[in-house]
Amino acid sequence: MPDKIKTIFATSSGNGVAAISVVRISGPEAINTIQQFFKTKTVLEPRKVVLKNLWWNQKRLDQAIVIYFEKTKSYTGEETVEVHLHGSIAIVGMFIDALGSLKDVRQAGPGDFTRQAFENGRMKISEVEGLANLINAETESQKIQAE
């Protein structure tokens, strides 16, 4: 049975220390979700980069790059917001924890973004299988075969 909460989030750049980490929020509440981290309402224009301070419980979490993708131009076929944070484990963890405390979003499980893309007609089953093979490729020949 599918989860009733349609808006999902997850780190899409991998885990661990990095200069930049990307957290993706995808679904009907994506814009409303990110707005909760802004001190003032901000109009997000599709595919325009915005530099914003992110706030939670009156504390500044980070200064981040925020990019909005309308559903017709996103990977998932859903309204999507990408948040490019500093890649500190503490910063990313605090942002993920804050997102997890909201009622209209849930943390994505493995393959949830691709499932959205498939359900919204953005990918065919053969593309989903090919992507899974590419992600799991351990050798160059497996990578080539997955393509």
Model-derived regions, located:
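A glycine-rich (often HGG/GG-containing) alpha/beta subdomain
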Residues: 1-147
